[in-house]
Amino acid sequence: MSTATAPKKPEHEIPFGADSPFILIARCHVKEECLDEYMKAAEIADKAVMATEDGMLHHTFDQDPDDPLMFTWSEVYKNDAALLFHLTNPPLVKFVEQHGEMGDKFEIEVYGTLSVETKEAFSASGIPIKYFDTKFGYSRIKTRKSKMWGVLCGKP
């Protein structure tokens, strides 16, 4: 009888689901007369998310190269819990309300597998959301507490 153990899987080979990282792309279109005010609101929301959401690993606001009124929030979440926190974070709730006044389109795509409960909670927002569940692959995303994160940020 062998006492050998199976080799440990590398940490980036994690099962996909509620505890795995995922990508969210939110596309929004701004009313032309509201562009300056919208940009200020988006920047305030971005800074607040950075200060309050440890589970948000990547958060950028990107302008479409062909339409100066179309923007994309590119977001990477640590897990489902990070998204659920994001959805109830007061600065984000305020920004979503502001988008309702200053924007005229908002749609979301999620790349990665979320739990059924998370999808139900997120879909209850009424925003059009398309879910792309993971079939296979891996993630090397590190959390802020990892050694690599400190190296990337210039903090040994």
Q: Residue locations for each model-derived region?
A:
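Short intrinsically disordered, low-complexity coil segments enriched in acidic
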Residues: 1-2, 96
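Short S/T/G/P-rich N-terminal loop/turn motif that feeds into the first structured element of a domain
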Residues: 2-71, 78-88, 101-156
